[in-house]
């Protein structure tokens, strides 16, 4: 038998590239991982993934990142082409995900790749197709959004053995969901979505404003999210920092869920997982495991990222010392959280006057059983199919209103100083012009009959932005100026500096609101999903599995009352475009049947003169505490700004002026502020008599599909009910007086219809 030496031949370049591609791209999930990392390197804030047949037939990933320059499209799919690395020494300080320039090249050698991309300075997008790393044809201009869309078709079409090994699309799709879910947890603040082609509902979806815990809840369920412990430690000697979330002793699953990111790379570490599970062995039942999400940031020069083709392994210095430090920190956190067990109770809402549905904590719980992840299966009749945090495009499409005045109204910025008083007084920097009194009068005269007219609507244009919107500088004996970070979003309290009120009467009114508040109702309003308006007085909202009918009039009235009390003396001003004579407004009110005027009360002119003189005496207090401004001639020139972008129905202005003079208790301080705030809240509330329901005439909708909805409906949904989420503590009597009614409950509907 003769031994003949074999001939060494140089492999064909296509064979070499295909072998290398098989190492880097082992399955569809690896391809998606590489492309997601490219999206993150491109500073994307939204990443959408669409797959077909587990990614073997189609993978489409789209981002809104920086895009790819047209000049780079020729070589973008060639091996060892990258924008993130220039020299080997750069690996010591690499901070991006990609560095070898192999991902797209490897994919193009085992699939058909099409790239559509547009940069910020590009006039249009460009589309190019690739095969074996080469451009098939010159890039073609096309329409497209900012960012990049990569389409991968027929993955492993030229590797028959690999395609046969990956014959289970469901398994591959599950691994894709796992990869995207893990990246979405680590990259809170970036929106991720994954769905099958042709499906309308995404299987993984995170919101751009969601926190890490929110994303864990969305991906792994409520059972783990409510049992999390936040961890974090830093060791400058070892040059590392760690943060993350781990489950406490209440939670356990049959298989360990371990999310490990080292310098923001999704990696695996068997030694670290075993070290942590050793700690949990003392707390969890046998054969059960914890949930772990850890993010380690180690000095880049101490990490070697170039040790595996798929980059799922890294090596780093001082590994044993770092593992020991992490193990000690987790053990200390678990030791401090093992003194209690948590149970949850649920009651009907809003059946009781007192708070319910609260978490019950027991301190004698070392012997209680652990919560199992498998026991939290959500059945169809218990599934909540809405998310209160979702936003609608309608919120950004504010309907154009028909102004009462022929003159265009605008938001103007004023900066005044009171020189005569010897102290600078920067007042009402953000003002809103309102219609002239003549139009208000004409509008109200048309309201005297039975015909209901629409609310006064305004066309608003934003003027120059002030550096300190609605800031009011005052120096009084009973107030002081402080920085305030609370209640920032909607009310007049969102000022850089606000006045702290030391008036006992106001503090007492605030305390009464707190004592009468219903926490469960507040939670319901905070997390509700708005369904729609029945009419100006009633609206539908969903909370969890229940549908509620809400009295918009009463809720908005309570909302404005609480804003007036809590933000007392901290309001901006809605400036009228022309001064409104109080005499004319009072006469309009007395002419209205709603005033209840009779001849026995005396001549209307005399009563109107009395109202003008009376309110002029109170003008200084009204302007200081309520931003209700009356000039020396007896003209109304400003109203308080309670909620941004909200203007009260001016048809109610005459009655409001009349009731200020007749229904407010001006003798006692507390009663004065309370009654004045209630009258003002009534004027600002959504009232049916001041809104025209053209859309419900004869029971038919007048709105054309695709048209802008009625402005009052937009205001109710996107201004009033948005404010209800965070600026109201509903009183307990709302559970009994019919202002909040439960109409339906999903489990009860299932008993009747046996389906959803």
From Swiss-Prot:
Xref: Pfam families? DNA_mis_repair (PF01119), HATPase_c_3 (PF13589), Mlh1_C (PF16413)
Biased region (Low complexity) positions are 362-375
Effect caused by changing residue 601 to G = In CRC; uncertain significance
Q: Please tell me, according to the UniProt entry, what happens when changing residue 264 to L.
A: No effect on protein expression
Reported effect, residue 292 to P:
In LYNCH2; uncertain significance
Question: Where in the cell?
Answer: Nucleus; Chromosome
Composition-biased stretches (Polar residues)? 443-457
Q: What is the effect of changing residue 474 to Q?
A: In LYNCH2; uncertain significance
**Oligomer and partners:** Component of the DNA mismatch repair (MMR) complex composed at least of MSH2, MSH3, MSH6, PMS1 and MLH1. Heterodimer of MLH1 and PMS2 (MutL alpha), MLH1 and PMS1 (MutL beta) or MLH1 and MLH3 (MutL gamma). Forms a ternary complex with MutS alpha (MSH2-MSH6) or MutS beta (MSH2-MSH3). Part of the BRCA1-associated genome surveillance complex (BASC), which contains BRCA1, MSH2, MSH6, MLH1, ATM, BLM, PMS2 and the RAD50-MRE11-NBS1 protein complex. This association could be a dynamic process changing throughout the cell cycle and within subnuclear domains.
Q: What is this protein's name? A: DNA mismatch repair protein Mlh1
Q: Which organism is it from?
A: Homo sapiens (Human)
């Amino acid at each position: 038998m003769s031994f003949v030496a074999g001939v060494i031949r140089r492999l064909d370049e296509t064979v070499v590239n295909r072998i290398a591609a098989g190492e880097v791209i082992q399955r569809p999930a690896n391809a998606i991982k590489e492309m997601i990392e490219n999206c993150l390197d491109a500073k994307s804030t939204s990443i959408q993934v669409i797959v077909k047949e587990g990614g073997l037939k189609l993978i489409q990933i789209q981002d809104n990142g920086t895009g790819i320059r047209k000049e780079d499209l020729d070589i973008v799919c060639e091996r060892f082409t990258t924008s993130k690395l220039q020299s080997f020494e750069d690996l010591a300080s690499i901070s991006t995900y990609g560095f070898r320039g192999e991902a797209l090249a490897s994919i193009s050698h085992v699939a058909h790749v099409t790239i559509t991309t547009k940069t910020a300075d590009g006039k249009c997008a460009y589309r190019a197709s690739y095969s074996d790393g080469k451009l098939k044809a010159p890039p073609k201009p096309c329409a497209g959004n900012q960012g990049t869309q990569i389409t991968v078709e027929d993955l492993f079409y030229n590797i028959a053995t690999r395609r046969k090994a990956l014959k289970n699309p469901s398994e591959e799709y599950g691994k894709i969901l796992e990869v995207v879910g893990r990246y979405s947890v680590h990259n809170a603040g970036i929106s991720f979505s994954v769905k099958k082609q042709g499906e309308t509902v995404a299987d993984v979806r995170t919101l751009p404003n969601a926190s890490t815990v929110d994303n864990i809840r969305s991906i792994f369920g409520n059972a783990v999210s409510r049992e999390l412990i936040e961890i974090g430690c830093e060791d400058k000697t070892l040059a590392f920092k760690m943060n993350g979330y781990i489950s406490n002793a209440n939670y356990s699953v049959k298989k360990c869920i371990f999310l490990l990111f080292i310098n923001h790379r999704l990696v695996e570490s068997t030694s670290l997982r075993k070290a942590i599970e050793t700690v949990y062995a003392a707390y969890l039942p046998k054969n059960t495991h914890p949930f772990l999400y850890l993010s380690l940031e180690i000095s880049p020069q101490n990490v070697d990222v170039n040790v595996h083709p798929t980059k799922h392994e890294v090596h780093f210095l001082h590994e044993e010392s770092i593992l020991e430090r992490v193990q000690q920190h987790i053990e200390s956190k678990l030791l401090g959280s093992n003194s209690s067990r948590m149970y949850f109770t649920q009651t009907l809402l809003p059946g009781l006057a007192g708070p319910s549905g609260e978490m019950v904590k027991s301190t004698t719980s070392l012997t209680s059983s652990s919560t199992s992840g498998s026991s939290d299966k959500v059945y169809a009749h218990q599934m909540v199919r809405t998310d209160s945090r979702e936003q609608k495009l309608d919120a950004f499409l504010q309907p154009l209103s028909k102004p009462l005045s022929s003159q265009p109204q605008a938001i103007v910025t004023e900066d005044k100083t009171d020189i005569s008083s010897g102290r600078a007084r920067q007042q009402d920097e953000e003002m809103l012009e309102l219609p002239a009194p003549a139009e208000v009068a004409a509008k109200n005269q048309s309201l005297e009959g039975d015909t209901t007219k629409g609310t006064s609507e305004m066309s608003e244009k934003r003027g120059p932005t002030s550096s300190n919107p609605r800031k009011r500088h005052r120096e009084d004996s009973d107030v002081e100026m402080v920085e305030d970070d609370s209640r920032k979003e909607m009310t007049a309290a969102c000022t850089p500096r606000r006045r702290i009120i030391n008036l006992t009467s106001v503090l007492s009114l605030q305390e009464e609101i707190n004592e009468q508040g219903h926490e469960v109702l507040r939670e319901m309003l905070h997390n509700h999903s708005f369904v729609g308006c029945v009419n100006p007085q009633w609206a539908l909202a969903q909370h969890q599995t229940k549908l509620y009918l809400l009295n918009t009039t009463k809720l908005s009235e309570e909302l404005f009352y609480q804003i007036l009390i809590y933000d007392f003396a901290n309001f901006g001003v809605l400036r009228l475009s022309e001064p409104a004579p109080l005499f004319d407004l009072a006469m309009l009110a007395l002419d209205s049947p709603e005033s209840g005027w009779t001849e026995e009360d005396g001549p209307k002119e005399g009563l109107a003169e009395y109202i003008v003189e009376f309110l002029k005496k109170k003008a200084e207090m009204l302007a200081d505490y309520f931003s209700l401004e009356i000039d020396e001639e007896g003209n109304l020139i400003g109203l308080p700004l309670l909620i941004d972008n909200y203007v009260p129905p001016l048809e109610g202005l005459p009655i409001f002026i009349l009731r200020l003079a007749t229904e407010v208790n001006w003798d006692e301080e507390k009663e004065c502020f309370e009654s004045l705030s209630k009258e003002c809240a009534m004027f600002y509330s959504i009232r049916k008599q001041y809104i025209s329901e053209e859309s419900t005439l004869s029971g038919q909708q007048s709105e054309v599909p695709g048209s802008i909805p009625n402005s009052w409906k937009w205001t109710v949904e996107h201004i009033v009910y948005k404010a209800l989420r965070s600026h109201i503590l509903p009183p307990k009597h709302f559970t009994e007086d019919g202002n909040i009614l439960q109409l339906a409950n999903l489990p009860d509907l299932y008993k009747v219809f046996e389906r959803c």
